[in-house]
Amino acid sequence: MKSKKLYLALIIGVLLAFLTLSSWLGNSGLVGRFGVWFAAINKKYFGYLSLINLPYLAWVLFLLYRAKNPFTEIVLEKTLGHLLGILSLLFLQSSLLNQGEIGNSARLFLHPFIGDFGLYVLIMLMVVISYLILFKLPPKSVFYPYMNKTQSLLKEIYKQCLQAFSPNFSLKKEGFENTPSDSQKKETNNDKEKENLKENPIDENHNTPNEESFLAIPTPYNTTLNNSEPQEGLVQISPHPPTHYTIYPKRNRFDDLTNPTLKEPKQETKEREPTLKKETPTTLKPIMPISASNTENHDKTENHKTPNHPIKEDDLQESPQENPQKENIEENIEEKETQNAPSFSPLTLTSAKKPVMVKELSENKEILDGLDYGEVQKPKDYELPTTQLLNAVCLKETSLDENEIDQKIQDLLSKLRTFKIDGDIIRTYSGPIVTTFEFRPAPSVKVSRILGLSDDLAMTLCAESIRIQAPIKGKDVVGIEIPNSQSQIIYLREILESELFQKSSSPLTLALGKDIVGNPFITDLKKLPHLLIAGTTGSGKSVGVNAMILSLLYKNPPDQLKLVMIDPKMVEFSIYADIPHLLTPIITDPKKAIGALQSVAKEMERRYSLMSEYKVKTIDSYNEQAQSNGVEAFPYLIVVIDELADLMMTGGKEAEFPIARIAQMGRASGLHLIVATQRPSVDVVTGLIKTNLPSRVSFRVGTKIDSKVILDTDGAQSLLGRGDMLFTPPGTNGLVRLHAPFATEDEIKKIVDFIKAQKEVEYDKDFLLEESRMPLDTPNYQGDDILERAKAVILEKKITSTSFLQRQLKIGYNQAATITDELEAQGFLSPRNAKGNREILQNF
């Protein structure tokens, strides 16, 4: 039996040794594929503890092997101690380094219930219990010293609080002076008093008190006045000993509180009051000002308890003489308290006033509350993508140092004061990318002076760029947004899994990212109803557009949403090729793009004609009636244009007019535009397009002029790039700063493959016209006669635009465009130039 146990131990030891070497040398390839695989798995689940967990396990198994009976209570208790130690290390590693799948999973499960503080308390508790179990330490030897220290500390704090808030508080009366050294000192003094009392009786009319009761008094009630030295906490009245002492046995201090005689009005009759009256001008000297009045009251209480002394009228007349003494003592107390009151200095009040840290912006919450929320019905024959297709969110958070914020506030205020701009920081709020300081200037400061200091403040704060909102809409403060020293990555999965996105009932919900305090932010494309996006190279424009497209794919099946993607650069939308949501193949030719826009405008007219028959105003109302009448419902049709500048350069007015028509009338019929451009200049974003696309998103642009073109104000040139953007919500005049979420190409491919595996794409062949041409056999086309009329009009007016022919010949826009292309094919007109105009060929 022993040999079998030994062989089993050797096999386990060799196996653990091999696995330990695999964990150490897995990446070197010396331990084979299995070793590399095991090292990766071990590090994934245990993090850095994977280097020591197997040797630790081997040591525990060796202790179990040496034990005669491994199932005894002591062995099981030690095993539990080892297990708690390992778990505490896993939790600590996960909290500090975010390593180890086991610790991360447990921490994520416990965090919503107990928070970060509870996790650290749990870790400390596990470490303490493991330490006590493994080292066989009784709890008394560990906790009792700390309990005694804690009790002493609480007692001292309680004493200080009573001294601060109760002017009649006495240390001896409350029993706080019963330390061993004081007790010994009192016993010595009591022994001396005992000898004096034996030699000299107190009074002829009174019996000598019991010696045992005198010696057994440890409380301050038996404090006597000694001739040799003044007692602590008393006022030295006279160098001569008093004429009378009254000594009482030990009494509980709570008996005094319940004694009805103490609640009666005290008569201030003392036998030593004549001495006080005579000696006060020369011998009144407070030793402890705080307890002087308390001692006097205590003496009054003792004399009040003596029933053998008659009250004389002379004494009652002399008692008011104590008032000057009390006033003198109180004056000394007030002087000393005034000298020892540094906590009420102006410096302390100034340092205690700190800006308020804001976790949620009220203006953003108001915008989000205006969206529609509710339950969304899941499609029957289609499975929406899950967030599991996206990469897991890295929980590594860059905690913002409050000292860094305080330093920035000091630098900011000092720099503003150099320009004679006074004010104070009222609120601060920090997010994943920037920290915003709300600066309230003095009444004499002009806001325009602060706007011109962005470069100076950026240099002072060593920031890449700062953005100044002067002022913030609806507030009396100026917003100064400063980049954080360490920025966080915002993942698309965070936004899609947020409560806002999950509970949004609109199928056209767009995930825009996070706001400047780190809260998710979404919007509804139906309420925008169109979106104009601008941003230079590297600003994160493509990342933001991809996040919007993916959020639409996460909400809608193919029969509810159709997309028309126009990608003149041929690389931005190629990853979405052949998804079942596409109405046409991804359009890369500008001429085909113009034809697609014209077809969308024609589809809009068709929808409105059908909606007028059913007497409805919106697509939602039409779809409800269509479902009840068995008619095909209208899907939402989203046109996504990646580069408007190339389209405008090629098509000019021919591209501008259909975009304007769709933007003007497409909302009620379920047609929406998402138009992006890299160059938001005046010739690209024309006044007609700006007027019909009120909701805009601007990533970082090159100049202030571009910012004013896209946003009608500056500020976009000061953005940080990498998804940092400004958004104009519908119905408001203000700007909302957001940070777009990031999704990798691999994540997009996973989502696209998941969608394509469920349903194949079905393109509408009649929707996309070849080179924006209508067939010559259209119903309203009259052949060569109308061509001759078109030539005559062009030669007479010298105008070659399609819209001009449309007005002169009184035909549709699509037919006029077809005639123009036919004239170009015949050589009558030249191709469009850079401005989108055609010329009449002279050699015709």
From Swiss-Prot:
ATP binds at G538, S539, G540, K541, S542, V543. Consists of an N-terminal domain, which is sufficient for the localization to the septal ring and is required for cell division, followed by a linker domain, and a C-terminal domain, which forms the translocation motor involved in chromosome segregation. The C-terminal domain can be further subdivided into alpha, beta and gamma subdomains. The alpha and beta subdomains multimerise to produce a hexameric ring, contain the nucleotide binding motif and form the DNA pump. GO terms for cellular component: plasma membrane. The gene is ftsK. Essential cell division protein that coordinates cell division and chromosome segregation. The N-terminus is involved in assembly of the cell-division machinery. The C-terminus functions as a DNA motor that moves dsDNA in an ATP-dependent manner towards the dif recombination site, which is located within the replication terminus region. Translocation stops specifically at Xer-dif sites, where FtsK interacts with the Xer recombinase, allowing activation of chromosome unlinking by recombination. FtsK orienting polar sequences (KOPS) guide the direction of DNA translocation. This is DNA translocase FtsK. Residues 134-844 are cytoplasmic. The lineage of its organism: Bacteria, Pseudomonadati, Campylobacterota, Epsilonproteobacteria, Campylobacterales. Its main location: membrane. It is a multi-pass membrane protein. Residues 518-708 form the FtsK domain. SUPFAM superfamilies: P-loop containing nucleoside triphosphate hydrolases, Winged helix' DNA-binding domain. Coiled coil: none annotated. Residues 183-206, 263-280, 296-314 have a biased composition (Basic and acidic residues). The chain crosses the membrane at residues 6-26, 45-65, 71-91, 113-133. Keywords: ATP-binding, Cell cycle, Cell division, Cell inner membrane, Cell membrane, Chromosome partition, DNA-binding, Membrane, Nucleotide-binding, Transmembrane, Transmembrane helix. Residues 220-230 have a biased composition (Polar residues). It comes from Helicobacter pylori (strain J99 / ATCC 700824). InterPro entries: FtsK/SpoIIIE/SftA, FtsK_alpha, FtsK_dom, Ftsk_gamma, P-loop_NTPase, WH-like_DNA-bd_sf, WH_DNA-bd_sf. GO terms for molecular function: ATP binding; DNA binding.
